[in-house]
Amino acid sequence: MVLLSVQQKYILETLRKLGCVRKDQLHALVRGKFQRPGFDISETRMAAMLRQLRSGLGDFHVDDDFVYLARGQPDTARLEAIDIMLELSAGAPQDFTVKVDSPQLLRFALDGDKLKVFSVAKLSHVSDPRLIQRERSERIVWISDSGTPLEGLTLPLKHFFAARQADGSHRFYGSNGP
């Protein structure tokens, strides 16, 4: 039996939801959830927690830049969706899930004056333009494999496109609608 800290339980919960994350993404999520004045989630502390989990749990893996449970595999689109969630939530989303319908990759909530829910979805050159129109009711951040918007892309209100920058961050473009 392994005794886990609250932070380690959160790490496992996060991996059960997301499958596979980069170390820097996991560190940002843990820091966003638990860091308070007088309690720092340093890289050293994070590395120690990951080491303890790896030695205590057989299905917990840390390889190079990735942390995952036994069946988790890196998915570049999902990893980019996690980056977007971290950027928009300043590393502290209220909640998130990957239990979404395709082409959505991730849904997350931002806390503030009003709870705001966003989805990150993948747009490809073969996507039906009606798909974008059908998804009008929610806030959606669209991404593409190329990291650039598709030619002639028109977005409805509350939809955004996340253009990937050279440093891995994103520039967000919104609709021109009312």
Where in this protein do the model-derived segments appear?
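Electrostatic, structured charged patches in enzyme active sites and in nucleic-acid/phosphate-binding
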Residues: 82-178
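Short, structured coil/loop segments at alpha-helix boundaries
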Residues: 5, 38-39, 74-78, 150-155
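Nucleic-acid-binding surface
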Residues: 5, 10-18, 24-25, 52-116, ...
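Short amphipathic alpha-helical interaction segments
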Residues: 36-56
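Short acidic, hydrophobic short linear motifs in intrinsically disordered regions
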Residues: 21-38
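Intrinsically disordered, low-complexity serine/threonine- and proline-rich regulatory segments
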Residues: 1-2
